[in-house]
Amino acid sequence: MKYLVLTVRRPAFRDDVRDAHYAFLDRLRAAGALVAAGPFTDRSGGAYVLTADSLDAARELALQDPLHLERCSTVTVHEWDAR
């Protein structure tokens, strides 16, 4: 199943966390869990698509994102019937 992860910047967003976030996405990609990722053009946040066995498993992965761990962005995971 595919899951859409939305990240929305908080006022406390710090640019120094971006590299850790990109490294996190690279690890997901290497593990075969990341389908696509990218920022919003208005720089308010971004989104990525995960494959996982369940919504809980997708949330567990997404909540390891440094953007969440450092409280720089809100992270929301949605089950997504992408075609």
Residue ranges and their predicted role:
Residues 1-83:
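Conserved, structured core segments of small domains
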